[in-house]
C-alpha cells in the first residue's frame, strides 16, 4: 500500500477537517431543531440520532489501530483521541436528552429508571465507563498513570462498545428491528477478533524466539 506521511501542517489540516466533519451531525441536529424538522417525535429523533453517532464514533475509534497496522500510516494514531472524545461528546448529548426530556433533570427519578429498566441500566453503565476514558485521554494522564496501566484502562472501550450495542439491541427489540444493532455488533466483533489474532500471533512469535534462545543456551 502507498505510504503517506503528512507534514506537521498537513496533519494539522487533517485534524481540523476531521474536527469540523465530526461536528456536522451536531450542526444538523441543531439546524433541524431550529427549523422544526425533527419529525412527529422530536425527542425520539434526538435520542436516536445522538445514540447512533456515539456508536459510529466508537467504531471509528476502534478501527484506527487496525487501519494503522494494515496501511502503515502510523500518523492515524494521532486522530484516535479526537474520535474517542467525540464519541464521549455524543454520549453526553444522548444522556442529557434522557435526563432532560424524560426526567426534567430529576436525578432521583432518573436513577430509579436506570435500576428499573435493564436496557437503560446497560446504556447508563456504558456512559459511566466512558467518563474515566475521557478524563485520562490527555498526554499528562498517560504519564501519570504509566503506559501499561493507561492501556489496560482504555481497553474498557470494547466493554463500552459491547454495552452500547446491547443497549441498542434491547431498545430495538420492541420493534423487532435488529438490522442496525447487528451491523454495529459485527463491526466491533471483527475489530476485536483482528486484535486478538494479532496478540496471539505476537505471543506465538515470542514463544518461538524464547524456545530458540533456550536451545542455544542449552
From Swiss-Prot:
Entry's cofactor comment: Binds 1 FMN per subunit.
InterPro entries recorded: Fe3_Rdtase_TM_dom, MsrQ-like
Coiled coil: none
Domain of life: Bacteria
HAMAP family linked to this entry: MsrQ
Key words of the record: Cell inner membrane, Cell membrane, Electron transport, Flavoprotein, FMN, Heme, Iron, Membrane, Metal-binding, Transmembrane, Transmembrane helix, Transport
Name of the gene: msrQ
GO cellular component terms listed in the entry, alphabetical order: plasma membrane
Cofactor(s) required for function per UniProt: FMN; heme b
Protein name from the UniProt record: Protein-methionine-sulfoxide reductase heme-binding subunit MsrQ
Role this protein plays: Part of the MsrPQ system that repairs oxidized periplasmic proteins containing methionine sulfoxide residues (Met-O), using respiratory chain electrons. Thus protects these proteins from oxidative-stress damage caused by reactive species of oxygen and chlorine generated by the host defense mechanisms. MsrPQ is essential for the maintenance of envelope integrity under bleach stress, rescuing a wide series of structurally unrelated periplasmic proteins from methionine oxidation.
Subcellular location: Cell inner membrane
Assembly with partners or alone: Heterodimer of a catalytic subunit (MsrP) and a heme-binding subunit (MsrQ).
One GO-annotated biological process of the protein: protein repair
Bilayer topology annotation: Multi-pass membrane protein
Amino acid at each position: 500500500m502507498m505510504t503517506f506521511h503528512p507534514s506537521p501542517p498537513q496533519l494539522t489540516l487533517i485534524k481540523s477537517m476531521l474536527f469540523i466533519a465530526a461536528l456536522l451531525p451536531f450542526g444538523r441536529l441543531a439546524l433541524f431543531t431550529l427549523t422544526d424538522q425533527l419529525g412527529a417525535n422530536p425527542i425520539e429523533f434526538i435520542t436516536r440520532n445522538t445514540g447512533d453517532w456515539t456508536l459510529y464514533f466508537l467504531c471509528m475509534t476502534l478501527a484506527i489501530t487496525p487501519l494503522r497496522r494494515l496501511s502503515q500510516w502510523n500518523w492515524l494514531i494521532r486522530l484516535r483521541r479526537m474520535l474517542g472524545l467525540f464519541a464521549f461528546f455524543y454520549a453526553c448529548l444522548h444522556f442529557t436528552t434522557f435526563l432532560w426530556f424524560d426526567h426534567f433533570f430529576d436525578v432521583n427519578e432518573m436513577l430509579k429508571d436506570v435500576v428499573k429498566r435493564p436496557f437503560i441500566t446497560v446504556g447508563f453503565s456504558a456512559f459511566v465507563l466512558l467518563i474515566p476514558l475521557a478524563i485520562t485521554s490527555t498526554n499528562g494522564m498517560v504519564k501519570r498513570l504509566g503506559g501499561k496501566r493507561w492501556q489496560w484502562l482504555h481497553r474498557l472501550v470494547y466493554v463500552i462498545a459491547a454495552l452500547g450495542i446491547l443497549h441498542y439491541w434491547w431498545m430495538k427489540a420492541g420493534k423487532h428491528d435488529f438490522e442496525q444493532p447487528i451491523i454495529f455488533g459485527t463491526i466491533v466483533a471483527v475489530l476485536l477478533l483482528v486484535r486478538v489474532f494479532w496478540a496471539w500471533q505476537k505471543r506465538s512469535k515470542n514463544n518461538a524466539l524464547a524456545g530458540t534462545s533456550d536451545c542455544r543456551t542449552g
